[in-house]
Each structure stands twice: as structure tokens, then as C-alpha cells.
């Protein structure tokens, strides 16, 4: 399954547009459990805890997007866009939304 942020695939013409596919992934960020990691992450300028949660959420959302496109018998998903939401940093949650257009290639 090809996943692309572009609307077309070079050298692979689109035969049919099958519709919009979307997915979401919610990851917990357990800052409360590891206060020292939070402290280190904050003063270190980068939050490894948050980066890890974002990476995992993006990977899960991508896999779900592929699964939904396969249900439509798609060859690829084009125009993929990821949106990130953090409903509450204190609540320790990150949400990644993925959307794209499922297509069949020639």
C-alpha cells in the first residue's frame, strides 16, 4: 500500500478515486508516573516522552488508514494529512488524525 502526502504519484497514474479514508490514534503520555523524565524532558528542550507518543500515534493512524483503504480495494492513499491534537497536556493524551483519498492505480 502506497501512502503519499502528494495528490499524485509520479509514474503511477490514478485510475479511480475511491473516496476519503480517515483514522485516528490516541496515545497516553504518562508524565505523572515518571516525574523525573518530565523534569528532564522539560529542561532538556525536547520531550522524548512526547516524541515517542507522537511517533507511535502517527504509526498507528497510518496503519489504520492503510487497513481502511484495503477495505475499498485501493492500491494507494494520496493527499495524506496528519493533524495532532493534545486535548490536555496535564491529562497526558495526544491524538493523531490521518486523512487521505483512497485510489486505484492503472
Curated annotation (Swiss-Prot):
The family database entries (Gene3D superfamilies) matched by this protein are listed as: Hypothetical protein apc22750. Chain B
Q: Which residues form a coiled coil?
A: none
Leader peptide range in chain numbering: none
Q: What InterPro entries does its record include?
A: UPF0145_dom_sf, UPF0145_YbjQ-like
Q: Which family does it belong to?
A: Belongs to the UPF0145 family.
What is the protein's name according to its record? UPF0145 protein PP_2873
Q: What is the lineage of its organism?
A: Bacteria, Pseudomonadati, Pseudomonadota, Gammaproteobacteria, Pseudomonadales
Amino acid at each position: 500500500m502506497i501512502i503519499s502526502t502528494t495528490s499524485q504519484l509520479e509514474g503511477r497514474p490514478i485510475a479511480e478515486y475511491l473516496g476519503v479514508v480517515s483514522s485516528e490514534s490516541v496515545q497516553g503520555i504518562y508524565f505523572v508516573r515518571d516525574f523525573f523524565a518530565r523534569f528532564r524532558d522539560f529542561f532538556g528542550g525536547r520531550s522524548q516522552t512526547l516524541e515517542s507518543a507522537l511517533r507511535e500515534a502517527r504509526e498507528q493512524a497510518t496503519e489504520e488508514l492503510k487497513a481502511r483503504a484495503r477495505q475499498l480495494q485501493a492500491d494507494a492513499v494520496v493527499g495524506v494529512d496528519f493533524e495532532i491534537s493534545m486535548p490536555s497536556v496535564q491529562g497526558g493524551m495526544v491524538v493523531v488524525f490521518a486523512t487521505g483519498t483512497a485510489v486505484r492505480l492503472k
